[in-house]
């Protein structure tokens, strides 16, 4: 199926109680729309439409390829179960699922529309190094929400700077559960994985039966590493063959506390047993350790910034939206 055949729902389309305004983004599994409800509140709506195995008919219904009906339905159930689980989570650091329903032979998830900027945009917009205080606060707060996600037997599996939003009040919110699945279920290995090189754990490449909270913790470590370097770490599958990752304790020793750098390096351990085993233990370490005293920006800082021009972190129009679903950074 050509992706050009997968036409998004048009502007003005009435989807139950919601009117479609525009497409925010699209990815391998879904479209995300900006819409308004009957009270004119702005929301984001995610539609399950895996482009490799299904297309949209003229009457807006989604039709799987004849050979892929079973796979489509498996993914549909996964998406629906994900909506059920996320709808139970009412946490300020997790994007709020307001509603989910079936229509057009597929499933829709209605989410709160967030205003602010992605962590990716924040990192690239800084004139100096991202402060240790900011890193500890953002990831400490985000850990509260991620603990709730793990309590629901869900994993995110695509945590990265583009999927963390910084609201106008400075609080972080975790977006885009496009890779989230009932990750403790055996059926998941059969559905195509979706992850971002550099931020995905080794288990996501090699043995999905080993997935657990420690897999999201690897991605948290990689995202904190990106705060230091403005680039993503080397991909885990490349690291296993030839580990060229420069440890955080070496990279950031003049600018960040030893304790923070050690936390980042432990999260990025290739062996999942060497990482923090729960978000609670990671959060405890982040909140207990003392940051270095604040320093004024120096010439060295400016040189470090110049040398660490963004390589893999790129802005796209979709990532300026409050909800994103892309597999790039």
Regions of interest found by a model, annotated:
Residues 21-27, 32:
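Protein kinase glycine-rich loop
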Residues 57-88:
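AlphaC helix of the eukaryotic protein kinase fold
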Residues 100:
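Activation-segment/catalytic-loop signature of the eukaryotic protein kinase fold
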Residues 104-118, 122:
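Conserved short submotifs of the Hanks-type protein kinase catalytic core
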Residues 138-139:
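Activation segment signature within eukaryotic-like protein kinase domains
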Residues 142-154:
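Protein kinase catalytic-loop region centered on the HRD/HxD motif
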Residues 198-294:
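C-terminal lobe helix-coil module of Hanks-type protein kinase domains
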